[in-house]
Regions:
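A glycine/proline-hinged amphipathic helix-loop "lid/cap" segment
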Residues: 1-66
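Short beta-strand element of the alpha/beta-hydrolase
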Residues: 74-83
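Structural signature of beta-strand start/N-cap positions in the alpha/beta core
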Residues: 76, 105-107, 148
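Conserved catalytic-core motifs of eukaryotic protein kinase domains, centered on the activation segment
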Residues: 89-91, 119-121
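Short amphipathic alpha-helix adjacent to the substrate-entry channel of hydrolases
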Residues: 90-111
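Short beta-to-alpha linker loops that shape the active-site pocket of alpha/beta-hydrolase fold enzymes
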Residues: 112-116
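Primarily recognizes the serine-hydrolase "nucleophile elbow" in alpha/beta-hydrolase
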Residues: 130-171
Length: 171
């Protein structure tokens, strides 16, 4: 299978550094290793503006990052990162979010939902749905007043995006 240069570089670096299998590590260690891997990757486009904020959820709050492209945005995208429900955060996925903002011409709001095992199901789903509701009601804060709203994600985040879209349709 053909892999792009960034993926090939990341895999070579992991092999060279003998990166452990994340599934064999306790969650805290897996999170640290995953973050180290991501810090070694090239950053995303720097012409994308970044602003962090807090979203209230179920008596707590979660972080979110608003990424605004230099060009005029055509949509407001809420993005849920992957990580097997256990690892990953908006810092680890910053480059991904920046690329999405630029290439999709979207204001991207990355949501740092709470993760297992500390926060088991349905906490991540509820966090993401609360984030969707908050972002929709506070479009002026995130900069997407008149833009169509879409949800997206990768891996566990793709699952969350699907569940949230269905729940929003049904409620």
């Amino acid at each position: 299978m053909h892999l792009d240069l960034a993926t090939t570089s990341m895999l070579a670096g992991m092999a060279l550094n003998e990166t452990p299998d994340l599934s064999t590590l306790p969650p805290d260690e897996a999170r640290l290793v995953f973050s180290e891997i991501n810090r070694s990757m090239p950053p995303g486009p720097q012409n994308v503006a970044s602003n962090d904020l807090e979203i209230p959820v179920d008596g707590a709050s979660i972080r979110a990052r608003v990424l605004t492209p230099a060009a005029s945005a055509k949509r407001l995208m809420i993005y849920f990162h992957g990580g097997g429900w256990v690892i990953g955060n908006i810092d680890d996925y910053d480059a991904v979010g920046r690329h999405l903002a630029e290439t999709c011409q979207s204001v991207v709001v990355m949501v740092d939902y709470r993760k297992a095992p500390e926060h088991p199901f349905p906490t991540p789903v509820n966090d993401c749905y609360s984030a969707l509701e908050w972002i929709d009601k506070n479009r002026s804060i995130v900069g997407g007043d008149a833009l169509p709203l879409v949800v997206a994600g990768d891996s566990a985040g793709g699952n969350l995006a699907t569940v949230i879209a269905i729940r929003a349709r049904d409620e």
